[in-house]
Regions:
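NAD(P)-dependent Rossmann-like dehydrogenase/reductase catalytic/cofactor-binding core
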Residues: 192, 221-231, 239-323
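Rossmann-like NAD(P)(H) cofactor-binding subdomain of soluble oxidoreductases
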Residues: 55-57, 61-143, 158-160
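Conserved active-site and cofactor/substrate-binding residues in soluble primary-metabolism enzymes
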Residues: 7, 11, 15, 35, ...
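NAD(P)+-binding Rossmann beta1-loop-alpha1 motif at the extreme N-terminus of oxidoreductases
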Residues: 1-53, 60-63
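Structural beta-sheet core signal
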Residues: 6, 29, 99-101, 128, ...
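Rossmann-fold dinucleotide-binding core
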Residues: 106-201
Length: 323
């Protein structure tokens, strides 16, 4: 029997913890909010995120100090933009066995989470869990497939946690590739939401997603990463899902964006928009040449205040090229 800690009692953290708790594991979910902790422990519910759903009675919640040596597996599911502050406050100077990063985005200082974890934390093994996964569908038992990446060997022990659940795991051997895909697809999802709000049609949506996938593949190649992973669950799978549904926070942000005066005003809400947090720093992180990434460039321009219609026209008027 494994002892598991899921850090973060938001929608995704709660869903993940609930799936893991249905097996013969001792599962704890960590939350800052003492009200949520009490509700999970006393009522087996988290109505802030799942109003009409009962959680597994085996799932327990904790808050405050974390003693990492108590746990065989630790899943990080708080926003990526809180990772450095959280890890320094709660995880530093402790030994961690298996650490699974489930957040898609860049840290406060604009870095990949695995890079920070490797340098600043005492971790035996680091993994990335990524792919198309809306929390509501996962927690209600709908089939979901995810990529689990490790730089060392097949993550057999970690993947075994999901055996006989509604989550099917596929192995990947490149952590950074999966992380980059997770960061970038959130940015493109903002663009997809903007297009949807402009009612440009299904043809435009299909073309947009296809060309975004092409740009993502180019980024991987430019960064000396495995560009074939664009065909993975963490690549095209997550991109299609995130660019097609209002369940996606980044897509919804894009839909609302053109009706607001600025990204600053819209981002005042309490929902984490990882794509917005990453959009201004991704170029530096991957050392990108934006000349070869016209869609990404246009999304950045729109967020900075340029006309959406002008950016769409600029994309359509570009010189024809081979696919």
């Amino acid at each position: 029997m494994s002892k598991i800690l899921v850090i973060g009692a938001g929608a995704w953290g709660t869903a993940l913890a609930n799936v893991l708790a249905k097996k013969k594991n001792k599962v704890y979910v960590w939350a800052r909010n003492s009200i949520i902790v009490s509700e999970i422990n006393n009522k087996s519910s988290n109505k802030k995120y799942f109003k009409d759903l009962q959680l597994s009675k085996k799932l327990k919640a904790i808050t405050g100090k974390i003693d990492t040596k108590e746990f065989d597996f630790i899943f990080y599911v708080l926003p990526a933009s809180q990772f450095e502050n959280f890890s320094q406050s709660y995880l530093a100077n402790q030994k961690i066995k298996d650490f699974i990063i489930c957040s898609k985005g860049l840290s406060e200082s604009g870095k990949l989470l695995s890079e920070i974890a490797t340098k600043s934390l005492n971790i035996t093994k680091i993994f990335i869990l990524s792919g198309p996964s809306f929390a509501k569908e996962v927690i209600t038992g709908m089939p979901t497939a995810l990529s689990l990446a490790s730089n060392n060997q097949k993550p057999l022990q970690t993947s075994a946690l999901f055996k006989d659940t509604n989550i099917r795991i596929y192995y990947s051997n490149n952590i950074k590739t999966l992380e980059v895909l997770g960061v970038v697809k959130n940015i493109y999802a903002i663009g997809a939401g903007i297009l949807d709000a402009m009612k440009l049609g299904e043809n435009a949506r299909a073309s947009f997603i296809t060309r975004c996938a092409s740009e993502m593949q180019f980024m991987l190649k430019q960064s000396n990463l495995n560009d074939q992973k664009i065909l993975s669950l963490a690549g095209i799978g997550d991109l299609v899902l995130t660019c097609s549904s209002t369940k996606s926070r980044n897509f919804s942000f894009g839909k609302k964006f053109i009706f607001m005066q600025s990204a600053k005003n819209l981002s005042k809400n309490k929902t984490t928009i990882e794509g917005l947090n990453s959009i201004m720093t991704i170029k530096k992180v991957l050392n990108l040449n934006l000349k070869d990434l016209p869609i990404l460039t246009s999304i950045i321009n729109v967020i900075k205040g340029k006309s959406v219609k002008n950016e769409v026209n600029n994309l359509l008027r570009r010189k024809f090229k081979y696919e």
